[in-house]
UniProtKB/Swiss-Prot annotation:
Name of the encoding gene: mrps7
Keyword Nuclease: no
SUBUNIT field: Part of the small ribosomal subunit.
Protein name in the entry: Small ribosomal subunit protein uS7m
GO cellular component, one term: mitochondrion
């Protein structure tokens, strides 16, 4: 069942670009990015943006839980929307770092780099995957070593029933 209240991909991206409630400026930024992509020779910029954002989205994430005093990290599969939120957040963080250039040029450059499997956003994604790999390797259930004496006690307890 499709939820009709879900926002489209374009609206979610425009809302991410929006600052201080300025929807018109955010929409203008989005459409100038699309125009810039068409001038660079990309036939379908909507499809291009969607595909590159899919490349940026992580499939797995990490959840931190407290077990007593220790704080452990556990791997978790992310829903597509949640992964998309991570990708957009990383994109905005990268845009905030580079203040000297124009915002639109930075967005276009980052999308072009992501289409070639490079760029800051994909580095963030692979850093997250390193954490997931760490969580997978260190949080496996470990078997307790049964001491020699305990195994002998268990064996004698079993003999009583024969």
């Amino acid at each position: 069942m499709v939820n009709t209240f879900d926002k489209t991909f374009e609206k979610r991206l425009i809302n991410a670009f929006m600052r201080k409630g300025n929807y018109i400026k955010a929409e203008r930024i989005y459409f100038t990015v699309l125009n810039r992509l068409t001038t660079l020779g990309i036939q379908n910029p909507y499809k291009f943006l969607r595909e590159t954002l899919i490349k940026m989205t992580p499939i797995m994430g990490v959840v931190k839980k407290k077990r007593g005093v220790k704080e452990k990290i556990y791997p978790k599969y992310l829903e597509p929307r949640m992964g998309e939120k991570y990708a957009i957040k990383w994109l905005l963080k990268k845009l905030e770092k580079s203040k000297g250039d124009l915002l639109i040029n930075n967005i276009v450059d980052e999308f072009l780099k992501a289409s070639k499997d490079q760029g800051e956003v994909l580095k963030e994604k692979w850093a997250l995957y390193k954490e997931v790999r760490y969580a997978l390797s260190f949080n496996k259930a470990k078997k307790k070593k049964v001491s020699f004496i305990e195994s002998k006690i268990k064996a004698t307890k079993r003999r009583k029933w024969y």
